[in-house]
UniProtKB/Swiss-Prot annotation:
Region Small ATPAse domain (RuvB-S): start-end pairs: 185-255
Provenance organism: Pediococcus pentosaceus (strain ATCC 25745 / CCUG 21536 / LMG 10740 / 183-1w)
Region named Large ATPase domain (RuvB-L): 1-184
GO MF, one example: four-way junction DNA binding
Protein name: Holliday junction branch migration complex subunit RuvB
Enzyme class: hydrolase
Source taxon at top rank: Bacteria
Sequence positions that bind DNA: R313, R318
Keywords: ATP-binding, Cytoplasm, DNA damage, DNA recombination, DNA repair, DNA-binding, Hydrolase, Nucleotide-binding
Gene Ontology CC: cytoplasm; Holliday junction resolvase complex
């Protein structure tokens, strides 16, 4: 398997992460899509500011690449407070958490990405920090060990996760605001593409923007990555102009089809069809046949194929749908099953 997929929803390099910073909106007004979530947050933020209180703790969950980190930064900006960012795996022990909490001023935001990966001992320390704004620290060892009560300023914890089901109930219940971020529609993605093109000083027409949007798997991060690659083709081959024809030609070379499938997605589907008659077949079996880990299949490939109706889950395993056979030009095989 290739190390990097142009249609992956994950950040693929530090350079890409830095470039995302330049594309991020600063306010809810600038933030495109997720309209229901934005409306709710506008109300919660306005109410908290009117009461001069910290915003309630926020949990953002959903697939990768949908803007959870961006939204956390927008929330902090709208609240006119500082944000400290970290991730679950980076907080290895209680002392790491205490150091982060100690930096917070009243009302500040602590953002923890991949919060489902917090060590259990750290998670348990968060309970009192979130609920009552204090932590108890044990200092010393053996008979001399004793707790120290450490008060904290009121703050907002924003947790982000792609796997909300892995959060423990006690942690999940301490979030007053819980928002599920959904895949984006093509109109919103096209607006994101146009906005990013403007920041890149690239010229793109509406049809070009919609063509990129239609192949972006409902994910802004993928839209921006495709735009970057297509911009290269435009500058070299089309006087910097991005139109529908250039987008189609460029993505054909990059092996991204009109539904956003790349060669790995197609390999998953064709392996199931050619070796197992379209299924049902288990994730572990699919993974073994294409040289991937089962978790990689279930987290990176399966969600989008399920979303667009190319796969379905059954009690006996995954099955390729008629829609997928038709897309792959194999409808005769489906009819002859």
């Amino acid at each position: 398997m290739e190390d990097e997929r142009i249609t992956s929803a994950e950040v693929q390099s530090p350079d890409e992460e830095n470039e995302e910073l330049s594309l991020r909106p600063q306010t809810l007004h600038q933030y495109i899509g997720q309209d229901q979530i934005k409306h709710e947050l506008e109300v919660y933020i306005a109410a908290a500011k009117n009461r001069e209180e910290a915003l309630d703790h926020v949990l953002l969950y959903g697939p990768p690449g949908l803007g959870k980190t961006t939204l956390a930064m927008v929330i902090a900006n709208e609240m006119n407070v500082q944000i400290r960012t970290t991730s679950g795996p980076a907080i290895e022990k209680p002392g790491d958490l205490v150091a982060l909490l100690n930096e917070l001023q009243p009302g500040d935001v602590l953002f923890i990405d991949e919060i489902h990966r917090l060590p259990k001992v750290v998670e348990e320390m968060l309970y009192s920090a979130m609920e009552d704004f204090f932590v108890d620290i044990v200092v010393g060892q053996g008979p001399t060990a004793h707790p120290i009560h450490f008060p904290l300023p009121p703050f907002t914890l924003i947790g982000a996760t792609t796997r909300a089901g892995l959060l423990s109930a006690p942690l999940r219940d301490r979030f007053g605001i819980v928002e599920h971020m959904n895949y984006y529609n093509e109109a919103d993605l096209a607006n994101i593409v146009r906005r990013s093109a403007g920041i890149f000083n690239s010229h793109i027409d509406d049809q070009g923007a919609y063509e990129i949007a239609s192949r972006s798997r409902g994910t802004p991060r993928i839209s921006n990555r495709l735009l970057k690659r297509i911009r290269d083709f435009a500058e070299v081959e089309n006087d910097g102009q991005i139109d529908r024809q250039l987008v189609s030609q460029s993505l054909k070379l990059l092996q991204v089809d009109n539904r956003g499938l790349d060669r790995t997605d197609k390999k998953v589907l064709t392996t199931m069809i050619e070796l197992y008659g379209g299924g049902p077949v288990g994730i572990s079996t699919i993974a073994a046949n294409i040289g991937e880990e089962p978790d990689t299949i279930s987290e990176m490939y399966e969600p989008y194929l399920l979303q667009i109706g190319f796969l379905k889950r059954t009690p006996r395993g995954r099955m390729v749908t008629e829609r997928a056979y038709e897309h792959l030009g194999l409808i005769d095989q489906y009819m002859n099953k």
